[in-house]
Amino acid sequence: ALIHAFLLNEYGHAVYHRKETYSLITREGEKKEKTLTEEQEKAVKALCDSIDRKAYEGFLLKGVTGSGKTEVYLQAARHALEEGGSALILVPEIALTSQMTSYFASIFGDKVVFMHSGLSKGERYNNRMRIMSGESPIVIGSRSAIFMPFKNLRLIVVDEEYDTSYKQGETPRYNGRDAAKVMAVIYHCPIVLGAATPSITTYYAACQGKISLLTMKERVFKTPLPQIHVCDLKENPPIDRSGLISAPLISLLQ
């Protein structure tokens, strides 16, 4: 009645429920900037230059385990934000979403949102609206996150691009990695396919020059890779009931 009598003005404002998802990742020291290695700096520069060109371009970031690929993703996403855009980081498994989200949220805070099928309808709606409004320009999720309503998408990252979990088995069937490539073409932005052991098709495309190859051969802290010993089971037949464990392995375990 007071509104109709012009004694009060009515305003509308959307309020989205926000879970305290990042309560465990704001410990002191986690927000410190990391010093990039020479290989990381080269990769970041290549991606940032591509973001500035505002055109589709494919990259294969081939780095050994522990080489700091995630930090490269983070720095490239930071540049996308500085240019007024958003970034999508895809991971193959839902279980990896929270791990990646925690890493990014320790730097970007509430600008990070995650999307996957394990969320409730209310959570998916809230996160979708935050993405659409640009409130959370960094989106981390599984393959379904590809179809979010992005605002000025400037970077797409597909981590562990070889993983078969990116393939949707049910109708509609699609490969999340390939769908991400199409989205990169639509949004005129670079796409980064990251892996220590890329798929044959992706690596072949890089070798043929269809996409750019960025390599990181050294670990961040110069720690050596674990030594691998090949054991011929014909010469060292398994001696356990399962028929899987050889005598040398049992000896090392004991």
Question: For each predicted feature, which ranges?
Answer:
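Conserved interdomain hinge at the start of the Helicase C-terminal
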Residues: L74-A80, C231-Q254
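Interdomain motor-coupling "hinge/lid" segment immediately C-terminal to the ATP-binding subdomain
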Residues: G209-K210, L214-G243
